[in-house]
Structures are given as structure tokens and as C-alpha cells.
């Protein structure tokens, strides 16, 4: 008898739409491969009923809060249902950008200087206090939600007059935010499949950075794979990514973003433990560059689930 697989998608996070696209692409792939798979929107389905409904395994296609933060992983472990991707602790830390950076920094991996602000303490911060901190970083800065993905709620701020609106925007998506030094450089993303680091992809966008529009809307964004890095530099980047990935105890499939500055140094940006699987997604592109089709990729991820 075939195993009954729940493709968990949708949810309540700000990345719901992308999750649905990813989830249905995964579902169709599993069906093509002959699996007994079903789409389960965690916003509407009582997740504690998965076992009673006969599901044997879960393929997590949820993005952001409720999917990448360890909560769904905890429920699945309680239900004793195997699932794809990283475990509870790795997921929780990885979605927390600030704590991820603290860990990477402790390993002497380059991360950009930042300021961490919590919504519950915002009344303690005066405008002059925040501005004084930012002036140490120097403008421009990037203001981003601490616990959100897909570049949602992120703005680049070049002038003090734009600070308050940008901070409030970021707080709409997370109770904690990061104000980070903006670094102009060449962006790369590196995918990991099980313990294998896939070829880096160079990202060229006409926008100031690789934002939501660049990822999901703009057709002008270019993805270069092979990346154009020389062998030594590419191996350096892959090694940095491998260390960063393993430090968090991640498993399965993921992606880490980095930027190369004008002094030829790589800086880590952030990690994605449940990367998108849409037609514009980068993990399938990296896999394809070494001969792994989309359906083969989905099967490989399924086979290394917990």
C-alpha cells in the first residue's frame, strides 16, 4: 500500500501565496512520480488530525512563521509523522536572522554589522537613540523583519527622514527587526541538498537589492549558473556555506545567500531552510545545472526526510 503524503502549504504567514505556489508544484511532482499525495492548507486543516486521516509522511512547503520556525516540526514530531527538512531547533534558529548571525559571527564567518530592536521595547527607544546607533553604521542601511522571508517588509534607507516609516513597516511583519549596514556588491545564492553544496547562482537585479519584486515579479532579474566565479573563489564560497549550514544543524534542502564586496570578500546574508519551489525558484535551477530534474529533486528531498 502506498504511503499517504501530506504536502503542507499555505498557512497564515506573509509568505502564504508563495507557499501555495511551491506546494502545488511539489504536489504535482509527487503525483507524476506515482505517490499518494494531497495538498493540506494548514490555515484550514486541523493539523492534529493528520495521523487520524491516515497520513504517513509530510512534505513541508510552508514558508515563514508557522512553517520554518520549528512549530510545525514540533507538531509532526509529537504525531510521530516523518517530515522533510530541518528539525525543530535548526528551524527555529534559522528563521531568527539575528541569532543566526550571532552564531555565524562566533565562527568567524563574515556578517554585516546591525542593530536589533524589539517591538515590546520600542517605547524605550527615542528617535535620537536609534539615529545615533545608525550613524555608527552609516547610511544607507537595510531595515528588515527579523522573522520573515521572501524579502517582505524590507527597505533600504538613505536618509533619517525615512527611518520611522521603514521601522514601522518592518514591525508589521515581525515583533523584532534588524537595522543592518547596506553593502553594495554582487549577490550569490547557494543551495544545499542533503550534505551536497550545489553550484552557486549569481543574481543580477536592476533594483537596489534582491527584493520581493526581483524574486517573484520582475522578469528582468538575471540568474547566472554557472556563476562566473573562478574555481578558487567558488570553492571558497561553497566552503563558507557548508560551515554556515552545518553550524545550524540543518538537514534536507536549503539555501544560503551571500554577497561579494569590492574587496573580494564574501559576507553571509541569511539562510532559507524551506526554499521556494516555484518556476522562478533557485534550488531547482542549481539542481538542474548538475543534471537533477525537478521531479528527481523532489524525490531526493522526500527520501532524506526525518
From Swiss-Prot:
Catalytic activity: 2 D-alanine + ATP = D-alanyl-D-alanine + ADP + phosphate + H(+)
Organism whose genome encodes this protein: Buchnera aphidicola subsp. Schizaphis graminum (strain Sg)
Tagged with keyword Ligase: yes
Protein origin, superkingdom: Bacteria
Main subcellular location: cytoplasm
A GO CC annotation given for this chain: cytosol
Protein name: D-alanine--D-alanine ligase
Catalytic residues, chain numbering: 15, 150, 281
A Pfam family: Dala_Dala_lig_C
GO molecular function (one): metal ion binding
Family annotation (HAMAP family): Dala_Dala_lig
InterPro entries: ATP-grasp, ATP_grasp_subdomain_1, D-Ala_lig_Van_CS, D_ala_D_ala, Dala_Dala_lig_C, Dala_Dala_lig_N, PreATP-grasp_dom_sf
Cross-referenced PROSITE patterns: ATP_GRASP (PS50975), DALA_DALA_LIGASE_1 (PS00843), DALA_DALA_LIGASE_2 (PS00844)
Compartment list: Cytoplasm
UniProt cofactor(s): Mg(2+); Mn(2+)
Function as written in the Swiss-Prot or TrEMBL entry: Cell wall formation.
Residue ranges of every copy of the ATP-grasp domain listed in the record: 101-303
Stored NCBIfam families: D_ala_D_alaTIGR, PRK01372.1
Residues that coordinate or bind Mg(2+) 2: 270, 272
Annotated residues for binding of Mg(2+) 1: 257, 270
Residues reported to bind ATP: 134-189
Known EC number: 6.3.2.4
Gene field: ddl
Pathway assigned to this chain's UniProt record: Cell wall biogenesis; peptidoglycan biosynthesis
Keyword annotations of the record: ATP-binding, Cell shape, Cell wall biogenesis/degradation, Cytoplasm, Ligase, Magnesium, Manganese, Metal-binding, Nucleotide-binding, Peptidoglycan synthesis
Gene3D superfamilies for the chain: 3.40.50.20, ATP-grasp fold, A domain, ATP-grasp fold, B domain
A single GO BP: regulation of cell shape
Amino acid at each position: 500500500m502506498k504511503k499517504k503524503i501530506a504536502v503542507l502549504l499555505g498557512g497564515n504567514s506573509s509568505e502564504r501565496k508563495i507557499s501555495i505556489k511551491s506546494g502545488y508544484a511539489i504536489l504535482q511532482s509527487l503525483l507524476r512520480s506515482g505517490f499518494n499525495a494531497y495538498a493540506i492548507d494548514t490555515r484550514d486543516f486541523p493539523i492534529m488530525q493528520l495521523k487520524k486521516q491516515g497520513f504517513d509522511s509530510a512534505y513541508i512547503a510552508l514558508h515563514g512563521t508557522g512553517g520554518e520556525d520549528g512549530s510545525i516540526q514540533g507538531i509532526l514530531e509529537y504525531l510521530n509523522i516523518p517530515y522533510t527538512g530541518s528539525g525543530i531547533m535548526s528551524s527555529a534558529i534559522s528563521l531568527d536572522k539575528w541569532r543566526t548571525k550571532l552564531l555565524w559571527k562566533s565562527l568567524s564567518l563574515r556578517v554585516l554589522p546591525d542593530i536589533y530592536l524589539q517591538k515590546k521595547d520600542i517605547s524605550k527607544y527615542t528617535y535620537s537613540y536609534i539615529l545615533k546607533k545608525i550613524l555608527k553604521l552609516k547610511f544607507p542601511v537595510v531595515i528588515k523583519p527579523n522573522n520573515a522571508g521572501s524579502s517582505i517588509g524590507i527597505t533600504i534607507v538613505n536618509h533619517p527622514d525615512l527611518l520611522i516609516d521603514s521601522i514601522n513597516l518592518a514591525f508589521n511583519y515581525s515583533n523584532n527587526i534588524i537595522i543592518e549596514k547596506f553593502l553594495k556588491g554582487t549577490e550569490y545564492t547557494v543551495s544545499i541538498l542533503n550534505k551536497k553544496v550545489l553550484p552557486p547562482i549569481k543574481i543580477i537585479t536592476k533594483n537596489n537589492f534582491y527584493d520581493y519584486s526581483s524574486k517573484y515579479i520582475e522578469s528582468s532579474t538575471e540568474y547566472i549558473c554557472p556563476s562566473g566565479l573562478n574555481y578558487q573563489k567558488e570553492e571558497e564560497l561553497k566552503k563558507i556555506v557548508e560551515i554556515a549550514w552545518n553550524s545550524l544543524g540543518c538537514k534536507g534542502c536549503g539555501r544560503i545567500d551571500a554577497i561579494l564586496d569590492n574587496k573580494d570578500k564574501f559576507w553571509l546574508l541569511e539562510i532559507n531552510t524551506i526554499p521556494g519551489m516555484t518556476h522562478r525558484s533557485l534550488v531547482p535551477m542549481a539542481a538542474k545545472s548538475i543534471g537533477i530534474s525537478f521531479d528527481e529533486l523532489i524525490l531526493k528531498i522526500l527520501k532524506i526526510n526525518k
